[in-house]
Structure formats: structure tokens, C-alpha cells
Design a protein with these regions (language model features):
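A hydrophobic, multi-pass inner-membrane permease signature
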Residues: 2-287
Length: 287
């Protein structure tokens, strides 16, 4: 038997498989990245050049930044970005505080009816979001919190899914650490902040990033609860650009605003992508 021939055939098959894999990954990458490329390209085209194209061009020979100037001057986009930042930071901080305490209670504390209460919590995930939005809107309106940051923030300060995810991570920490801490007269809160949170930091960071993305991209709730420009978020800004006339006509300027809004989230993901993967991996591992 010619082992060298067999080895060459195996290497050839491996090389062909690798080429096919790279081609498929390249095609998938193009499909994923093309919408963002098109958005950036359109934002760099002048109004006249964009409307003169009968067939949209995949490049531009005369890029311009005027659309970005229009995005900030036609509407107070800077103020909307600041409002979104305030909403995102406060909401995320409050949610992390709430879900951390709730997850710790379900994971480590013993109290009557714990399993029943947790089951009821999980059952809330079965309720359609549309019903929750209606209930939240009615409640916030009755409390006279429309057009306030408090009205924007309150419905988003907890998440059953994140409580469940963090509880599962807390339960992966050996019980011996908890018992040893109790022997040393360590309080539950001190054990939580000194032991559990540092160990489960990757998952907590992942939750923070996912919540930041969720808040930054909020669309339905801000439109329902605010009709005062003082409390508009970036999603309201995009809608305002379209409604005030130039957004419908001047697509390049609207794309420029979308690029500005998207860049912070893209940078956030690129910076913390390893921690996100670590948190997801830990969340899917038992023991």
C-alpha cells in the first residue's frame, strides 16, 4: 500500500475542505457586512449624486461629510444621544443591582415557597411583550410619569431571563465556599460582593453589554411614553428626521444619523467581544 499516496489524497481533501469553508465564510461575511457598508456609503454621497443614480452605485468618487452636519443640525441629535446615554446608563445600573440580588436570593437563600416563586417568575416569560407594553403604558400614564426619565426607565429595571441566567451561574459556584464563608461569620451580602460577583464577572459583563445594546436600540417604548423633545432618544430622532421632511427626501442624511447611532454599539462589541463569548460559554456550562 502506497502510504504516501494516501497521505497526499488526505491532504488534498483537507485543503479542498478548507478552501470551501473559507469561501463560504467569505460569502457569509459579505452578506453580513454589506448592509453596513451600504449605509456608510450612502451617508457619504451628496444629495444630488444619490438622487441622480438610476442604478445605485457601489462606490462614490466624491465623498462628503455634509450629511453628518445635516444630521446634527436638522434635529438636535446630540441632545438625543445624551438622553439615550443617560437612559442606558441608569437603566443598566439599576437592572444589574436588582437582578443580582434576585438571582442570589433564588440561588443561595432558603425560604418557604422559593421554587414556587421562581416558577412564577419564569412563567412571566410566556407573556407576549405586546401585553406587557400595554400594561406598562397604562401604569406609567396613571402615575403621571409620561415624558419623564423615570417613566422611560422603570419598566426596564428588571429581566426574568437575566435573573435566570445569573442564578444558574451563581449555582455553579461550589456550595463549600458559601459554607466556609458562613463559618467565618461572613454576611450574605459580603459573600455576594466578595465571592460570587468576582467569580461570575464574565456573565455579569455579558448581561451589562446586552442590556446596553437593548436600551440603546429601544424603539417602541420611547415612542409610546414620550412626545416631548426634551426626553427624545435616538430612535425618536430617526423618526423625527423622517417626519420633518428631509429624512424622507434626503436619504443620505438619514443614513448619516444611523451611522452615528450605530458606531458606539459596534465599538462596544468589538472591545468586549471576548468577555461576551466567555460569559455565554460559562452560562452554557454546568458544574
Amino acid at each position: 500500500m502506497d502510504y504516501q499516496l494516501l497521505e497526499r489524497k488526505a491532504q488534498r481533501r483537507k485543503r479542498i475542505s478548507r478552501i470551501v469553508l473559507y469561501v463560504l465564510l467569505t460569502l457569509w461575511g459579505i452578506i453580513v457586512l454589506f448592509p453596513f457598508y451600504w449605509m456608510v456609503l450612502t451617508s457619504l454621497k451628496s444629495y444630488g449624486a444619490y438622487n441622480a443614480e438610476y442604478i445605485p452605485a457601489l462606490y462614490t468618487l466624491s465623498p462628503t461629510l455634509k450629511n453628518y452636519v445635516d444630521a446634527f443640525t436638522q434635529v438636535p441629535l446630540g441632545q438625543y444621544l445624551l438622553n439615550t446615554l443617560i437612559f442606558t446608563v441608569i437603566t443598566t445600573a439599576l437592572m444589574i443591582f436588582v437582578i443580582t440580588l434576585a438571582a442570589f436570593a433564588f440561588a443561595r437563600l432558603e425560604f418557604r415557597g422559593k421554587n414556587v416563586v421562581f416558577t412564577l417568575f419564569l412563567s412571566l416569560m410566556m407573556i407576549p411583550n405586546e401585553l406587557v407594553v400595554i400594561t406598562n403604558f397604562t401604569t406609567i400614564t396613571n402615575l403621571d410619569l409620561r415624558n419623564t426619565f423615570l417613566g422611560l426607565i422603570l419598566p426596564s429595571v428588571t429581566s426574568v431571563f437575566y435573573i435566570y441566567l445569573l442564578k444558574e451561574n451563581f449555582e455553579q459556584v461550589p456550595n463549600e465556599l458559601y459554607y466556609a464563608a458562613k463559618v467565618d461569620a461572613t454576611s450574605d451580602l459580603k459573600y455576594l460582593f466578595k465571592v460570587l460577583i468576582p467569580i461570575c464577572r464574565p456573565t455579569i459583563i455579558t448581561i451589562i453589554i446586552l442590556k446596553v445594546i437593548e436600551c440603546w436600540n429601544s424603539y417602541v417604548w420611547p415612542h409610546l411614553i414620550t412626545d416631548n423633545e426634551k426626553y427624545y432618544l435616538v430612535s425618536n430622532g430617526i423618526q423625527e428626521i423622517r417626519e420633518n421632511g428631509f429624512g424622507r427626501e434626503n436619504i443620505p442624511a438619514m443614513m448619516a444619523a444611523v451611522v452615528v447611532i450605530s458606531v458606539p454599539l459596534i465599538l462596544l462589541f468589538l472591545i468586549f467581544r471576548k468577555k461576551i463569548m466567555a460569559g455565554v460559554s460559562r452560562g452554557g456550562t454546568k458544574g
